[in-house]
């Protein structure tokens, strides 16, 4: 179903269901022979949600049937697992580096089923603010506490739609804009219209004291190229049809969730506002972590740029 201006969702619907797909990919990577990451909670989320399109990543029995339906499906699924594994490792390392540098305020925007509050070794005194739709945060917290999990930092849930006045809600929850913070906008930006992207980073910039850090994965150049989009949509259509047969469930059409619009380049925008910025493309990040993109699959993933930044003093 196409997006609307005021749409909302729970964990099994629309954008919320993508969080389960991410969790399923993290579970598959965690349980692989040589995992890049360890997320012991990912499998818990997938099992708590029940059967759905996310099952295809986390159920080895389904993968054995994939080749009979679509020769390229297994490779595409592994590429998605690699994508999520490298993305997760990138953000994990970013957070831990900020913690080592003494930053004790953490803000996770569109937190989804990100379980870093529970699984990363946060230093004493760290406060993690998680922002997302109320139903998404409730599912996560309830599921983890039912399994005896306890956060490894002081966790503050801020249940709010990021299209609303989340800076006000964040500060009312205890966030101190006079102190450095570490921000993440992981798996978020392509689900925002271009104007909403601009507003998001304007708000982050306004709340960031010197020494603050920011990481995000954002649409890269070529994201809106019509020919590339057509190839990606056709590839996704074939994979979605095969996957739907495997799980006997409707598969979300991600084309309906993304906004393929021309956007302000986030890296240059941040540099102009006093941030030191580093970037890596999806292919560069995959290579950094020893993963590769299968031949012929270059267009199956949207062009993505990984951005990490630090706010300079003065």
From Swiss-Prot:
Function: Exhibits S-adenosyl-L-methionine-dependent methyltransferase activity.
GO biological-process terms attached to the record: methylation
EC class: transferase
Alphabetically ordered keywords of this record: Methyltransferase, S-adenosyl-L-methionine, Transferase
Annotated positions binding S-adenosyl-L-methionine: 132, 161-162
Keyword Secreted: no
Highest taxon of the lineage: Bacteria
EC number: 2.1.1.-
Organismal lineage: Bacteria, Bacillati, Actinomycetota, Actinomycetes, Mycobacteriales
SUPFAM superfamilies: S-adenosyl-L-methionine-dependent methyltransferases
Protein name listed in UniProt: Putative S-adenosyl-L-methionine-dependent methyltransferase MAP_0256
GO molecular function, one term: methyltransferase activity
Source organism of the structure: Mycolicibacterium paratuberculosis (strain ATCC BAA-968 / K-10)
NCBIfam families: mthyl_TIGR00027
Pfam families: LCM
Family named by the database record: Belongs to the UPF0677 family.
Keyword Transferase: yes
Alphabetized InterPro entries for the sequence: Ppm1/Ppm2/Tcmp, SAM-dependent_MTases_sf, SAM_mthyl_Trfase_ML2640-like
């Amino acid at each position: 179903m196409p997006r609307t201006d005021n749409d909302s969702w729970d964990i099994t619907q629309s954008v919320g269901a993508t969080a389960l797909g991410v969790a399923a990919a993290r579970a598959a990577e965690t349980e692989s022979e040589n995992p890049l990451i360890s997320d012991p909670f990912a499998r818990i989320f997938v099992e708590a949600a029940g059967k759905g399109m996310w099952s295809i990543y986390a159920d080895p029995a389904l993968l054995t049937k994939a080749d009979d339906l679509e020769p390229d499906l297994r490779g595409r699924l592994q590429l998605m697992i690699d994508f999520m594994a490298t993305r997760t490792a990138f953000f994990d390392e970013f957070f831990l580096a900020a913690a080592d540098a003494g930053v004790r305020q953490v803000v996770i925007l569109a937190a989804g089923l990100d379980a870093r509050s529970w699984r990363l070794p946060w230093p004493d005194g760290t406060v993690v603010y998680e922002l997302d739709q109320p139903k998404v945060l409730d599912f996560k917290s309830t599921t983890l506490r039912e399994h005896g999990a306890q956060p490894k930092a002081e966790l503050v849930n801020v249940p709010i739609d990021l299209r609303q006045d989340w800076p006000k809600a964040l500060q009312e929850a205890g966030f101190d804009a006079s102190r450095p913070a570490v921000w993440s906008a992981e798996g978020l930006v392509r689900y925002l219209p271009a104007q909403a992207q601009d507003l998001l980073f304007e708000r982050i910039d306004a709340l960031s004291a010197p020494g603050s850090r920011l990481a995000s994965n954002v649409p890269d150049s070529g994201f809106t190229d019509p020919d590339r989009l057509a190839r990606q949509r056709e590839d996704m259509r074939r994979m979605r049809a095969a996957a739907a047969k495997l799980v006997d469930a409707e598969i979300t059409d991600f084309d309906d969730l993304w906004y393929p619009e021309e956007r302000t380049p986030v890296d240059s925008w941040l540099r102009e506002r006093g941030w030191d910025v580093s970037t890596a493309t999806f292919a560069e990040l995959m290579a950094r972590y020893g993963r590769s993109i299968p031949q012929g699959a270059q267009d199956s993933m949207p062009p993505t740029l990984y951005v990490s930044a630090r706010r300079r003093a003065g």
